[in-house]
């Protein structure tokens, strides 16, 4: 039987941990079990409970102090250490067979765009631990206010899709922050990115030298036709969480990974007709 895992990716501050917790909470409310695996050795203490935590193996702060490295160098060292000790991860995952594991990943995208750290871990999960994996890439909705920044984020999402070679779901998080600034009709244009959005952008006037570059990036995203977003509002719209989970279930074939359950025998109650 295959395990099911979800990777939460995206820049720092987009709400990955909040997303992970929202998915966990929703799954618990419908009677399903799931756990968060923290893969960020620099994670700050939070209200969210991690079932498996890379900081039990190695932490960024310890590496910075002992190896005299900066934050980025220490982060790479932590992941290289993890790759050399994947048996620790195997042991921690252990008997989690019929439960979701949600991997909360660091926000530094160079871990999969510049060095093959995350792709290596992904392949290990697939081949050695028999995981059906799905990647989710979060981009915060306020990016749509700065359209060139939005298309830059969409390009990063596409890069992750290509390099990780996983079923991929892109998510526009923190939708509640732009509800008073962007209409539903306009938002739909960002959920399925349209390069024509740049034509109405003030960026072309304030930064004319970047207009050509921004247009090239937008057209590249459009040419591949790979990037679409689902809206997410963890604070006020539980339906958006349920919708995203249904997409994850579909691409990971969750229902097919479940063992058939024995039918519950009906118990006939004795009735006294007298």
UniProtKB/Swiss-Prot annotation:
GO terms for biological process: mitotic sister chromatid cohesion; protein import into nucleus. SUPFAM superfamilies: P-loop containing nucleoside triphosphate hydrolases (SSF52540). Residues 265-274 have a biased composition (Acidic residues). Residues 255-274 are annotated as: Disordered. The keyword Hydrolase applies. A motif (Gly-Pro-Asn (GPN)-loop) lies at residues 70-72. One of its GO terms (molecular function) is GTP binding. Keywords: GTP-binding, Hydrolase, Nucleotide-binding. GTP binds at residues 13-18, 173-176. Small GTPase required for proper nuclear import of RNA polymerase II and III (RNAPII and RNAPIII). May act at an RNAP assembly step prior to nuclear import. Heterodimers with GPN1 or GPN2. Binds to RNA polymerase II (RNAPII). Belongs to the GPN-loop GTPase family. This is GPN-loop GTPase 3.
